[in-house]
Amino acid sequence: MLTYETWEEDSMSFSERDETKGALAVLEWAYKQYNDEIVYACSFGVEGMVLLHLINEVNPFAQVVFLDTNVHFCETYALIERVRQRFPKLNIIEKQPGLTLEEQEDKYGKDLWEHNPNLCCKLRKILPLEELLANKNAWISGLRREQSETRKHTKFINQDHRFQSIKICPLIHWTWKEVWRYVYKHNLPYNPLHDVGYPSIGCEKCTLPVGKYGSSRDGRWAGSVKTECGLHDQ
């Protein structure tokens, strides 16, 4: 089994010539390699809908984790229930932070996401995933190279120094149009916020709609230099 400790650069290759641009082959390899020792960390954005559909084909009983910060859009929570109905065998869990919002406010002050968003992300997303991955050898992410400069060198299989794990990214070669084409083709549920200017959807407090010519990440932490929650930092 390939682990963080036994990592070998470029030890695997996958054909990218099928409809899924290699994604299905990567997932088949991942679940054969790791079985129950892998989890998909899903934000339930539109890329997530594609991955959930593909994962369901490979392993309908796969574990999926949603990092519930307790400040997501109500549309996101509603979508999770629709996904549960569409893929009833998937093991979808909602991972809670160590602190409630009230406990966080008592300890760090009101509206931490405004005056220290990095700490807020650490408490409500990074530490919960870190706790979960302590018992796993690998995790799956919906990163695409097209999304941003910080993601353009992502590979199918990555040594993840942040979580000392293996990070699997099946959709690296997909474009925004290809993602939506797949969603429409398979009649997949998706967050209605995508239809009103939200290409990337995170916590309600830190996500804004973007203009017609904005990039897919422009609405996240708008007005600050922050571009990532920290899950994908190396």
UniProtKB/Swiss-Prot annotation:
Signal peptide start-end: none
Residues annotated as catalytic: C229 (nucleophile)
Keyword Ubl conjugation: no
Keywords: Cytoplasm, Iron, Iron-sulfur, Metal-binding, Oxidoreductase
InterPro entries recorded: PAPS/APS_Rdtase, PAPS_reduct_dom, Rossmann-like_a/b/a_fold
Record-listed [4Fe-4S] cluster binding positions: C120, C121, C203, C206
SUPFAM superfamilies: Adenine nucleotide alpha hydrolases-like (SSF52402)
Location of this chain's protein in the cell: Cytoplasm
Record's keyword annotation contains Cell membrane: no
Catalyzed chemical reaction(s): [thioredoxin]-disulfide + sulfite + AMP + 2 H(+) = adenosine 5'-phosphosulfate + [thioredoxin]-dithiol
Short name of any one Pfam family annotated for the protein: PAPS_reduct
Single GO term (MF): phosphoadenylyl-sulfate reductase (thioredoxin) activity
NCBIfam families: cysH, PRK02090.1
Homology family: Belongs to the PAPS reductase family. CysH subfamily.
Entry function: Catalyzes the formation of sulfite from adenosine 5'-phosphosulfate (APS) using thioredoxin as an electron donor.
Protein name: Adenosine 5'-phosphosulfate reductase
